[in-house]
Amino acid sequence: MSDSLIDLLLEVGKALIVLVGIVGAGAFMSFIERRLLALWQDRYGPNRVGPFGLLQLAADMIKMFFKEDWIPPFADRRIFILAPIIAFTAFILAFAVVPLTPTWGVADLNVGLLYILAIAGLAVYAVLFAGWSSNNKYSLLGSLRASAQTLSYEVFLGLSLMGIVIQTGSFNLRDIVEAQAGLWNVVPQILGFITFLFAGVAVTHRHPFDQPEAEQELADGYHIEYAGMKWGLFFVGEYIGIVLISSLIVTLFFGGWHGPWLPPFIWFALKTACFMVFFILLRASLPRPRFDQVMSFGWKVCLPLTLVNMLITGAVVLINVQ
């Protein structure tokens, strides 16, 4: 067996391990969320299936797998099927350039940051396709909300990272992590971090920015007509998006795998888990604002913060160069 074939098989195996880990983390987060919400709300939560309810996730997956794969007769069948597939795969593909350790990662692209923004932006097509193809007024309204919110906050998501690019001079995520060996980016880029955090919550449609899926207003929004595994793909895709945003926060602002004593991957996993729990805490503690308030907050607060952050970072870098 040639060396090139061995290298190819190793890369494929590495990609499969990352894929299984990401999907597993996203699925397991749904169980952790239910347990934590129950703890904070002084109730039991899932505790019937397996010890401490640990098999509840497997029971939910089996239930979704055997539910009827129903497609409304008035729906656009092809687009209706395509939407959850895009929603599930977009965030997974974005993980290809996230470095987990100094030597472990699927791909090492010099334009890794641009790749993530481009691939993650494909998720908005899944929302539009789901709302349009369902031929349901609530689904369409939810998809229009989601597309407007996602497209707006993706602007702030990208601009909030430009300070890091100016500071490090690279779009490569591995270079950005290595540049944080002495000082994490969250200190000089605190404005960028705050904006990225808000934008990440909005792009993943998580509470309190879950207006596209507001049950009280839109009856679950753009996936109201979905059931079974198609709904499951949307469901798991949302949690994978949370894992992606959490890992990006760690990679870009909190030093990635850097940390004392423990192995690099353990540090990366612990930091990512902390922000995943933070996402759950937001759901448990904050009310849902109106949709116009969400959009106004983005354009009137997040956009000025990103521009000020870029100006300050550019001025500091220019002064240091001179």
From Swiss-Prot:
The keyword Endoplasmic reticulum does not apply. It is a multi-pass membrane protein. It catalyses: a quinone + NADH + 5 H(+)(in) = a quinol + NAD(+) + 4 H(+)(out). Keywords: Cell inner membrane, Cell membrane, Membrane, NAD, Quinone, Translocase, Transmembrane, Transmembrane helix, Ubiquinone. Its main location: membrane. One of its GO terms (biological process) is aerobic respiration. The chain crosses the membrane at residues 12-32, 79-99, 111-131, 151-171, 183-203, 234-254, 262-282, 301-321. It is an enzyme of class 7 (translocase). PROSITE patterns: COMPLEX1_ND1_1, COMPLEX1_ND1_2. The keyword Iron-sulfur does not apply. It comes from the Bacteria. It is found in: Cell inner membrane. It holds the Pfam family NADHdh. One of its GO terms (cellular component) is plasma membrane. One of its GO terms (molecular function) is quinone binding. Its EC number is 7.1.1.-. HAMAP family: NDH1_NuoH. NDH-1 is composed of 14 different subunits. Subunits NuoA, H, J, K, L, M, N constitute the membrane sector of the complex. Belongs to the complex I subunit 1 family. PANTHER family: NADH DEHYDROGENASE SUBUNIT 1, NADH-UBIQUINONE OXIDOREDUCTASE CHAIN 1. NDH-1 shuttles electrons from NADH, via FMN and iron-sulfur (Fe-S) centers, to quinones in the respiratory chain. The immediate electron acceptor for the enzyme in this species is believed to be ubiquinone. Couples the redox reaction to proton translocation (for every two electrons transferred, four hydrogen ions are translocated across the cytoplasmic membrane), and thus conserves the redox energy in a proton gradient. This subunit may bind ubiquinone. This is NADH-quinone oxidoreductase subunit H. It comes from Aeromonas salmonicida (strain A449).
